[in-house]
Amino acid sequence: MHSSELMVTRIADRRWHALAGDRVVGCGEASPRPDGRLFLSIDSWHADAFDRLAAAMLADLPTPLYTVVDEVDHELTAHWRRAGLAIRRREWEYRVPTDPAITGLDSASPPGIEILNFGAAEAHSLCELDRTVRAEVEAAAGWQTMPAEVISPPIDPANYVVAAQAGRYAGLCRVTQPTRLPRIGLIAVRADAHRRGIARALLGRALGSLHRAGKAWASAEIDESNAAATALFEAIGAERSNSALELVWR
């Protein structure tokens, strides 16, 4: 197939097809994330079709534009780099043991802190805490450094272990199970409650609950620039299992 045979058509606001005659040989899509960023994806076995789709999407859409690739997929990374995108950040995926005998964590609470199990938090107060830590993260590193799944989740107390201090929620740990492997999506502590062992206690309670439920492992994604989270997870025996690259077109 020669590039001269290809035609790229925008079939919807955020969808494109690459056609060779009457055959669809590639598809492109732009998907908005909850933080407002637009992420691109292209599905094609043909390099020429990929290049033409990428060029059309980059020309049609407002910048900045983003995509995420598995770091071991060198061919896909090369396609996007050839289109002009640059690597913005790296995210590590960790395989996290849940057994307290391995992690060294227990379910004990720091002095003055109460840890509420999954489903025990009051929804309104949990939403208030979520808004507080969201604003604090945005003012510091920014939510663009966070995994996409944690940017704007629905608030379901069943997915949260929560720390309370003097009647006020101080920290949370969100765990979901999109597959058989539970995912630790977010650990966050209010800025005025840092350095009290709350994050470690939240993680200990969450992992202990998963272990008692028969889950030997969980997963977590951590931005490589997040030294505190990296240190916390590696100290309990978590191991890197994969990595993803986020690329950007400006």
Please tell me what each predicted stretch does:
Residues 1-7, 131-150, 156:
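Conserved GNAT-fold acetyl-CoA-binding loop/helix
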Residues 71-90, 196, 200, 224-242:
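Conserved active-site alpha-helix within GNAT-family acetyltransferase domains
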Residues 8-10, 113-128:
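A short beta-loop-alpha structural element at the N-terminal edge
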Residues 61-72, 210-222:
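Conserved GNAT acetyl-CoA-binding A-motif
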Residues 44-112, 245-249:
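Acyl-donor-binding surface of acyltransferase catalytic domains
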Residues 30-35, 141-189:
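A conserved beta-strand-loop-helix scaffold within acyl/acetyltransferase catalytic domains
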Residues 47-59, 189, 195-212, 230-235:
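Conserved acetyl-CoA-binding loop-helix of GNAT-fold acetyltransferases
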Residues 2-61, 69, 170-182, 190:
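Conserved donor-binding loop and adjoining core beta-sheet/short helix segment
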